[in-house]
A protein has these predicted regions:
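Terminal, charged accessory segments of proteins
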Residues: 1-137
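Catalytic core segments in nucleotide and nucleic-acid processing enzymes
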Residues: 134-256
């Protein structure tokens, strides 16, 4: 498997992005991953600011093990013959089996839990406990896309911000729509290496629905300003193509 576009962990092995901008340490890169993982895991769990800051100090495997533990109710390890029979529970057999297998498939203990509380824990286990091994790998381009999308929705509340899957569209009444493509790619200002993305932007403009296309990448030390792109074959059209740096620093600032 090619791990080039993935971040996360495979057992004790961590796949963190190369250091960039102010993300110059293992702790900051872990914190970045924990924050961005919320976009994919939002229906299962959420790492709050405190967890992001403190779990970043330990390996990602341990961080997710701690998160699973925090999602389980306090009575998770009660034996069948010791639990409070006067307390009512809605048992979820599938979730119970998942959690039992996660802790110890040979144990004689059985979990007596409230299914409403258990389901997130079981779902998280099913996402990151694969073949009896802790593992969670995510597409970094998807994570960056979701991060930019959330930022744009907060910034342009008076406009229509649409997630088109491979791109983002911003529409406003009586104004030509803007199309945005995101990519987690290290950009060097003198040699940005974005020919493929620019050619795609040219085709989008030629189709006529958009005259502005922005190519957004993570901000880095050598990529701090917009890079305008001029295209000879579009010189008689009104258009705008830009490569734009997008900062991820707010993730660190939020958790200080």
């Amino acid at each position: 498997m090619d791990f080039t576009n993935f971040v996360g962990f495979d057992g004790k092995k961590e796949l963190l992005p190369c250091g960039f901008d102010t993300f110059d340490s293992e702790v900051k890169l872990r914190q970045l991953f924990l924050h961005l993982s919320n976009f994919v895991l939002n229906s299962i769990c959420h790492f709050n600011k405190y967890e992001q800051k403190n779990f970043a100090k330990i390996p990602l495997k341990n961080a997710f093990e701690s998160k699973i533990k925090s999602l389980l109710p306090l009575h998770k390890l009660n034996r069948l013959n010791n639990f409070d029979k006067n307390r009512k529970f809605n048992l979820c057999s599938s979730s119970t089996r998942i959690i039992n297998n996660y802790y110890n498939p040979k144990t004689s203990q059985r979990l007596i839990v409230n299914s409403k509380k258990l389901i997130p824990a079981a779902k998280l286990i099913s996402h990151c406990f694969i073949n009896n091994k802790m593992q969670l790998l995510m597409d970094k381009n998807l994570l960056f896309h979701e991060f930019v999308l959330e930022k744009l929705r907060k910034l342009h509340k008076d406009k229509e911000v649409l997630d088109l899957g491979d791109s983002i569209s911003i529409k406003q009444k009586d104004v030509c729509a803007l199309k945005i493509y995101t990519s987690w790619k290290n950009i060097q200002r003198k040699d940005p290496n974005i020919e493929k993305e620019v050619n795609h932007a040219i085709n989008v403009i030629k189709e006529g629905d958009y005259n502005q296309v922005y190519l957004i990448y993570p901000k880095d030390n050598d990529f701090t300003r917009h890079i305008p792109v001029y295209v000879e074959e579009l010189k008689y059209k009104t258009y705008q193509i830009k490569a734009i740096p997008y900062s991820l620093r707010s993730i660190i600032r939020k958790n200080i």
